[in-house]
Design a protein with these regions (language model features):
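N-terminal accessory segment detector
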Residues: 1-124
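Short beta-strand
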Residues: 120-123, 172-176
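Short, hydrophobic/π-rich interface segment
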Residues: 127-174
Length: 176
């Protein structure tokens, strides 16, 4: 999940460079992208796994929030939503059950530590799968950079829609 979060941050950064929203010489923006994407098992602190993972999550969430908040100053939200959708299409779920689609979502989105129990399944059958978020684990990162937590959810929804593209499945979620 951390790796996917880093991929999403890089995807937005590269799109910003390509579209001229950031200059490649903008060192502040470049610092928001983690270049070292080695497998976690190669860099994990096995003596303190829980704290190490929490720090990685905090770092990844914070850099993503700061990058997107920086972009929202000059880039229309519709453009950022298009980028999020395209990122989702890179990770399409294909023709899967609703349960498998949820698993794909759960595998790609960083929602804190497993012990945070952010998503609770509320219904599952062959035609419908629903869950509720028990608390907003992302808002603190966005607020820290004077961003709007709703931005995270708007972009996440577009990633999810991109992931479902061509699957025949429909995502119903609140508009933020």
């Amino acid at each position: 999940k951390i790796k996917r979060q880093e991929e999403l941050t890089i995807y937005f950064y590269n799109a910003a460079i390509k579209n001229g929203w950031f200059d490649e010489k903008d060192s502040e923006a470049a610092l928001l992208v983690k270049k070292d994407l080695r497998p976690l098992e190669d860099i994990i602190d096995t003596m303190n796994i829980h704290a190490w993972l929490q720090e990685c999550i905090h770092d990844a969430e914070g850099r993503y929030a700061k990058l997107i908040t920086k972009l929202t100053v000059t880039v229309p939200m519709i453009e950022l939503e298009k980028i999020a959708f395209e990122f989702g299409k890179l990770h399409t779920v294909g023709k899967v059950s609703v349960q498998d689609a949820y698993k794909f979502f759960d595998d790609i989105f960083l929602n804190g530590m497993p012990c945070d129990r952010v998503n609770i399944i509320t219904q599952q059958d062959n035609s419908c799968f629903s869950w509720e978020q028990t608390h907003d684990i992302h808002a603190e990162y966005w607020l820290a950079f004077q961003g709007y937590p709703e931005t995270y959810y708007k972009l996440r929804k577009q990633v999810m829609l991109g992931m479902l593209d061509g699957s025949g499945l429909i995502l119903e979620s609140p508009d933020y």
